[in-house]
């Protein structure tokens, strides 16, 4: 079955203008890749109907969701969406169980391939069901929000960095579950992530955004391989360990480690795209990143 998503139009922002002319069948899961501020979150907000100023048209499966020329739009809650943003937004003042029940009450009437019990068990939520949403950690909120979105049995699932607050083990488990569940449920997916390995495992086609404009579009594995080769031509990766950081001075001290790979935190490892030797003086500048919700 085709799930054709059409987005044509513009939305002006302070740092970029989202300028889109997309026509894709999201029956094959679609990934969105781009730097912070490229417009990835804004694109998902346009699909979800959260950007009323979008001067264009959004269609899904032949249904017009937004027509800026005629000031016509279908409200977000009537689009049959499952949406998870990076902050894992839940209904305040309710327990996890109440949040999940809210989704079940409004779920589409379809045959479910994955049960409530299977979801809460696999997402490690059973011990949290009686907890208020406000006391959850970032990773717990994301998992609860993901369960709620799936329990709504959506027509289209929009995920924006939905695993970022979870540890590596949880992330890999969640990727495996999503890769199994979504085809079983027949749920089309639009997935935003900075993580190439997540996109490689969960999506089949990819759009690369740069300052609000599509700079590349094609098969996920082809575009990711091309990106990897381009980085490799620029420089040979050199691994190092971050020994200390000075946030006030925005500096970090690194030590080369040829077996290392990982994240730039004290005592952790980071890959550097520079040609270096053991005698190289090495430093790094820390730069605060803008809020992804702004782009």
Regions found by a protein language model. Name each.
Residues 63-67, 111-128, 179-180:
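Conserved ABC ATPase "signature" region
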Residues 65-82, 106:
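ABC ATPase NBD coupling module
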Residues 132-136, 140:
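Conserved ABC ATPase signature
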Residues 151-155:
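A short, proline-enriched helix->beta-strand linker immediately N-terminal to the Walker B motif
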Residues 157-161:
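Catalytic Walker B motif of ABC-type/P-loop ATPase nucleotide-binding domains
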Residues 211-212:
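Conserved ABC ATPase "signature" C-loop
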């Amino acid at each position: 079955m085709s799930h054709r998503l059409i987005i044509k139009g513009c939305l002006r922002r302070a740092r970029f203008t989202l300028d889109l002319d997309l026509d894709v069948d999201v029956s094959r899961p679609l990934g969105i890749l781009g730097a912070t501020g490229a417009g990835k979150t804004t694109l998902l907000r346009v699909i979800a109907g959260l950007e009323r100023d979008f001067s264009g048209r959004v269609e899904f499966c032949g249904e017009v969701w937004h027509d800026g020329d005629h000031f016509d739009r279908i409200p977000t809650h009537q689009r049959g969406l499952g949406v998870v943003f990076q902050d894992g937004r839940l209904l305040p003042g309710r327990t996890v169980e109440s949040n999940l029940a809210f989704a079940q009450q409004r779920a589409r009437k379809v045959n479910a391939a994955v049960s409530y019990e299977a979801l809460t068990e696999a997402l490690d939520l059973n011990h949290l069901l009686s907890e208020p949403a406000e006391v959850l950690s970032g990773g717990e909120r994301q998992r609860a929000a993901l369960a709620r979105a799936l329990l709504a049995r959506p027509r289209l699932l929009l995920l924006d960095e939905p695993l970022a607050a979870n540890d590596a083990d949880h992330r890999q488990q969640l990727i495996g579950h999503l890769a199994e569940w979504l085809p079983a449920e027949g749920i089309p997916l639009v997935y935003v992530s900075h993580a190439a390995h997540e996109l490689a495992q969960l999506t089949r086609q990819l759009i690369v955004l740069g300052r609000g404009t599509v700079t590349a579009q094609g098969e996920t594995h082809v575009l990711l391989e091309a990106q990897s080769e381009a980085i490799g031509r620029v420089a040979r990766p050199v691994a190092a360990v971050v020994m200390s950081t000075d946030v006030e001075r925005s500096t970090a001290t690194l030590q080369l480690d040829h077996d290392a790979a990982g994240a730039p935190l004290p005592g952790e490892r980071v890959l550097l795209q520079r040609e270096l030797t053991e005698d190289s003086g090495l430093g790094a500048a820390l730069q605060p990143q803008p809020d992804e919700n702004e782009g």
